[in-house]
Amino acid sequence: MAGQIFDAAANQSAVWAVILGAVLATAGGFVATQMERYVEHHRRERNAALFFGELLTTLQIILYHAHNAHDRGDPFGPITLRMLKSARKEIDIYDRNRETLFDLRHGDLRARIQNLIIRIAMPIEGVFDATDEIQRCQDQLRDAVAIPRPDLEERVESLRQQRASGYEFIMETVEALPKIIGDLEPLAHQSFRKLGEIGRNI
């Protein structure tokens, strides 16, 4: 009788050991999976912060040089327009990688980046459109040199004002870049200040 009781107790202990082992294995697997997800999420967030930090720093450098060119000679001469086209290319890179933005966990930061890009992209397109339209109007004025065209002259002046306003809006928007870049630095575990300084001194 005592042996039977002992065997039953031993069997019960074995069952509990199996159950405990299964629970620990499940818990261990769950913890390992969660840790893996945590590490992967932070890796992706760091890569995203590096990407957007470098992209926005490059955009800042390009627009810095565009502003310098704008203040010398023809405000919207070939150099200024070339710089603005380079800025547009950086925005195109952003557009192609926009889904990476969701790897940043801070919704406010994501919104600020997206809003800033839109506020720069739209007036840049406006500058290009106005420049092309001004050129067309000036070509028409040259072709009709013997015939006064006050309507075209007024159109050219209006387009120039629109272009100047769009450019000023771009430069005002750019002032928000340093703060956004600074907020990306802790996530990227890297400072972008040196890159910006080198770019401005080129």
Where are these predicted regions, by residue range?
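Membrane-embedded hydrophobic alpha-helical segments
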Residues: M1-E40
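Interfacial alpha-helical end/capping and short helix-turn segments at domain and membrane boundaries
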Residues: G53-E54, T58-I202
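Juxtamembrane membrane-water interface segments immediately C-terminal to a transmembrane helix
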Residues: M35-Q60
